[in-house]
């Protein structure tokens, strides 16, 4: 739905993409300026609703079944779901947070890997997500190997993060990807 809208609304921007590339989220987003990216994403985020999966995940985080939730989503739905149970986990935006603070991120946190829709910078394009994966390589390796971790947002094969996990996961703690 989002890619279809980008293809319709920004057709002129996508002229130099192949038909196959026009189906690729990262390739399409790379043809939009940040304000256009943010506007199109905000439209979908404003419609997003909490569901039972968000509530269950919030409960797992609150009860320490998961160390951290690492999300590719820009929305705050999980944070809102946590608040329904009077739980207010720290939330971090690693798109703008300095690397020197990464080791201080506690368990029971929600960590936005590609930014937050209300933030200053979003990793949307193929180039920006690859760069972000490289920037977070050590953080991801440390996180997935020191406590149970859950990734949420998409299948993972969509950018360089899946390869990072595949290469660095030792299997000593549970890893979930939903």
Model feature map: region roles:
Residues 1-148, 156-159, 163-178:
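Conserved catalytic-core helix/loop/strand module for nucleotide-ribose chemistry
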Residues 153:
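Extended basic-aromatic, gly/pro-enriched interface segments that bind polyanionic ligands
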């Amino acid at each position: 739905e989002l890619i279809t809208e980008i293809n319709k609304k920004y057709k002129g921007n996508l002229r130099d993409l192949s038909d196959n590339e026009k189906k690729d989220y990262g390739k399409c987003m790379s043809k939009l300026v940040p304000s256009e990216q943010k506007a199109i994403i905000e439209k979908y985020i404003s419609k997003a609703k909490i569901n039972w999966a968000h509530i269950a995940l919030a409960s797992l985080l609150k009860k320490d079944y998961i160390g951290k939730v690492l999300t590719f989503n820009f929305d705050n739905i999980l944070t809102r779901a946590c608040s329904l149970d009077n739980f207010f986990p720290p939330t971090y935006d690693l798109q703008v947070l300095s690397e020197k603070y990464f080791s201080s991120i506690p368990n029971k946190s929600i960590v936005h890997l590609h930014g937050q829709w209300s933030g200053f910078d979003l990793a949307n394009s193929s180039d920006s997500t690859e760069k972000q994966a490289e920037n977070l390589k050590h953080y991801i390796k440390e996180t997935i190997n020191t406590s149970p971790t859950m990734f949420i947002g998409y299948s993972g094969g969509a950018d360089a993060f899946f390869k990072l996990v595949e290469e660095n996961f030792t299997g000593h703690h549970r890893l979930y990807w939903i």
